């Protein structure tokens, strides 16, 4: 049985049905904008939610538990450093269950330097699919691990802030944080 992510823009499997995951661990942290929920499976970060308590649905084979030390503790520490302007890169094991196209988009997003932004069109060109700016935007809207996979660094071709899973207030906050 698969574990499912519920987001405002749809649902999709958090981990493949073939994966053996008996427990997820969840922790909620405070930030200047609002609370964030971080979720791990085994020793990998699998999701970040801008709406704590909204992201996951337990199944008979998977239970959500309070965090163990390990990846969530490290993720919280690194996120706090990031919010204080002391960290520009994360070193957390990430785990996603995405299509090849979505994975290629997110892999390229990981290469965008801290403090820089690029357009959806430029990102489409970088992945070798120049006509796919809208598909790139759709893939970014399904990023299960925002901030750690910095999709907030992608903006409209005209420089405007557009779509972000956490909302435009979060996107603006993160871009401003990185520009200072």
Could you tell me what each predicted segment is?
Residues 147-154:
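Short Lys/Arg-enriched helix C-cap and helix-to-coil transition segments
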Residues 2-131, 177-180:
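Basic nucleic-acid-binding alpha-helical/helix-turn surface characteristic of O6-alkylguanine DNA
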Residues 157-180:
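…primarily DNA-binding HTH/wHTH and HhH modules…
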Residues 134-143:
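Regulatory, non-catalytic segments
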